[in-house]
UniProtKB/Swiss-Prot annotation:
Protein name stated in the entry: HUWE1-associated protein modifying stress responses
Cellular localization per UniProt: Nucleus; Cytoplasm
UniProt similarity note: Belongs to the HAPSTR1 family.
Function comment: Acts as a central player within a network of stress response pathways promoting cellular adaptability. Functions as a negative regulator of TP53/P53 in the cellular response to telomere erosion and probably also DNA damage.
Comp. bias (Low complexity): 147-172
Gene that encodes the chain: hapstr1
Organism: Danio rerio (Zebrafish)
Broad class of the protein's primary localization: nucleus
Pfam families per record: TAPR1-like (PF15251)
GO biological process: cellular response to xenobiotic stimulus; negative regulation of signal transduction by p53 class mediator; regulation of cellular response to stress
Length: 265
């Protein structure tokens, strides 16, 4: 018994930080340093949300397209509306579940980082740690002024809040993810039952609106959903841009000499 005790004491002799801990303690520290939060769950959740967003964007776009087509033929819009409502509802439910999973994962990651900070602080301390030093470290406060030596202190970094730029984004920029979702949805072929009248997928996202009137006259059934939405957005956004530019031109005050009357007699 005495020989084992002497071996244990020799193992933790205070000749340096590497000798302060026993073999079991060093093993625990090594395992704690190797713990990494699983990122696969986060990636899968993001992929699922993006897939549901694609379905919702396609359903909403199809509802808008069928409104024009089926009103001309006197058909009901219940089926496209039901598909859009179902897609949006599924997106909401999955968003709630993903938020809860992200919250729990954040707590887990916070505990792991806190443990690593404490263990890193313990490695730099003596074999015996004072209670007030540990409490001051965990609370982020200065230790009581009864020790001549200033103990290490945890740097409490306040979360920086990035002030968003006050630049107003245009409608086209805001709807860019919506257009990308429809385009990728058409390429992947998912939710084909929603796109009842869509043509062959894979059409380009950015199309000019010059051919929109001719295609409308030829009928909307031959136009795929991606092309239809791109032409609609280009048509309406271009009209809004022209109106704003013309209004700005009217507000300009010309100071040309031709507009001044010569009052000299």
């Amino acid at each position: 018994m005495e020989e084992k005790k002497e071996e244990g004491e020799a193992e933790i002799q205070e000749h340096g930080p590497e000798h302060w801990f026993s073999k079991w303690e060093r093993q625990c520290l090594a395992e704690a340093e190797q713990e990494e939060p699983a990122e696969e769950e986060t990636d899968q959740s993001q992929q699922k949300l993006w897939h549901l967003f694609q379905n919702s964007a396609t359903a909403v776009a199809q509802l808008y397209k069928d409104r024009v087509c089926q009103q001309q033929q006197g058909l009901s819009l219940w089926v496209p509306f039901q598909n859009a409502a179902t897609a949006v509802t599924n997106l909401y439910k999955e968003s709630v579940d993903a938020h809860q999973r992200s919250y729990e994962l954040g707590i887990q990651i916070g505990h792991q980082r806190r443990n690593k900070d404490v263990l890193a602080w313990v490695k730099k301390r003596r074999r015996t740690i004072r209670r007030e030093d540990l409490i001051s470290f965990l609370c982020g406060k200065a230790p009581p002024p009864r020790s001549s030596r200033a103990p290490p202190r945890l740097a409490m970094v306040s979360p920086s809040r990035s002030t968003p730029s006050e630049t107003s984004s245009s409608v086209e920029t805001d709807l860019q993810p919506f257009r990308e979702a429809i385009a990728l949805h058409g390429l992947s072929g998912a939710m084909a039952s929603i796109s009842m009248r869509s043509g062959a997928p894979g059409s380009p996202t950015h199309l000019s609106a010059s051919s929109a009137p001719s295609r409308r006259r030829n009928g909307l059934h031959d136009v795929d959903l991606n092309t239809f939405i791109a032409e609609e957005m280009a048509l309406h956004l271009d009209n809004g841009t022209r109106k704003r530019s013309s209004a700005q031109c009217n507000d300009v005050i010309t100071d040309s000499p031709t507009h001044k009357r010569n009052r000299m007699i």
